[in-house]
C-alpha cells in the first residue's frame, strides 16, 4: 500500500504520476465550491471565508477547469473505473444555479463517460437556511426551501464490468445518503467533507491494494479513507498548507462513524456495477443492474 500527496495540479496528473496512468480504480473528489470560498485567500487567513460573486465569465472558466480535470481523470482510470464527484448547487444573490446538472451535461457531451447514478447526500443537520423568507412572505413566488443536499455524481469509463464488494451495507445502495457534515472548526480547511463519504465509495468500488485518486484532495479525507481501507491513493492540491494538513491526517484516528464500519453483506452475485455501453438500465440500488 502506498500514499502519495502531491503539490501540483491534477490537470497534469499523468505527468506527476506516469506510472499510474490506466491504473486508478476510482477517482473520488469534491471540487472547490464554485463561488463560495476563495481557497487561496483562506490558506493565508483561515479566520475569514472569502466569497466571490457568480458571473457567466467565471462560470465558464470554472467549468473549463473541471472539464480538464475530468479528462485527465479519464486518462488515469483503468478501463471500467469509476469517477465520483461530490458537488453542491450554487446560490448567489437569491438565485439557485444547478451546478450538478451542468457537470452531468458536460460529462455527457464529452462522449467519454457512462452515466451510472446520482446519489443525493442529505446533510441531516446542516445546510443553507432559506425557509425564513417563506415565513416572512407566505406567497408561492417566495418558496425557497432550505438547501440540505448535495450531489454525488457517479460515472464510469468504458470497460469490463466489475462486481461490487460483498461487504457493502444495504443502506449504501439507496439513492439518498444521510451523512452529517464535518463539525465547524474541527478541520483547518474551509470545506472538508466527511470521511464517511469517500469511505463508502472506496469500499464499494475498489479492492484492497488498488489505487484511488482525488484531484482536489484538500484536507485529505479521501487519502485518509483509502489508507484506513488498505487502498493505495494519490491526492493533489495546489496549496502547500493543505498538502501538510492532508499528510498530518494520515496518522490520525478514523472519523468514520462506527455504524459505517459494521459489515452487513449483500449478495454480490445479484448485482454488477454500472451499465453496459449505450444503455441506461439499472436495477435496484446504486447504479447497478441484475445479470
Where are the model-predicted features located?
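Short, conserved SAM-binding/catalytic segment
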Residues: 1, 247-261
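Short, flexible loop/turn segments with low-complexity composition
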Residues: 164-169, 257-267
